[in-house]
């Protein structure tokens, strides 16, 4: 059970920053 929670948390720790960076890149591309 604990390993599942840790695995899910790890996925979010990767996806959230990746999503923020991806959104920033899209805004920069649209701005140009």
From Swiss-Prot:
GO biological process, alphabetically ordered? photosynthesis
Q: Which UniProt keywords apply?
A: Electron transport, Membrane, Photosynthesis, Thylakoid, Transmembrane, Transmembrane helix, Transport
Keyword Signal tagged: no
Q: Which GO terms describe its cellular component?
A: cytochrome b6f complex; plasma membrane-derived thylakoid membrane
Q: Which InterPro entries match?
A: PetM_cyt_b6/f_cplx_su7 (IPR012595)
What is the predominant subcellular site recorded for this chain? membrane
The membrane-spanning stretches of this chain are 5-25
Q: Name one GO molecular function term.
A: electron transfer activity
Indicate yes or no for the key word Thylakoid: yes
Kindly give the membrane topology term recorded for this protein. Single-pass membrane protein
Family from the record: Belongs to the PetM family.
Return the HAMAP family for the record: Cytb6_f_PetM
**Quaternary structure annotation from Swiss-Prot or TrEMBL:** The 4 large subunits of the cytochrome b6-f complex are cytochrome b6, subunit IV (17 kDa polypeptide, PetD), cytochrome f and the Rieske protein, while the 4 small subunits are PetG, PetL, PetM and PetN. The complex functions as a dimer.
Q: What does this protein do?
A: Component of the cytochrome b6-f complex, which mediates electron transfer between photosystem II (PSII) and photosystem I (PSI), cyclic electron flow around PSI, and state transitions.
Q: What is this protein called?
A: Cytochrome b6-f complex subunit 7
- The encoding gene is petM
């Amino acid at each position: 059970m604990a390993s599942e929670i840790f695995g899910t948390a790890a996925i979010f720790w990767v996806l959230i920053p990746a999503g923020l960076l991806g959104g920033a890149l899209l805004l920069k591309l649209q701005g140009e």
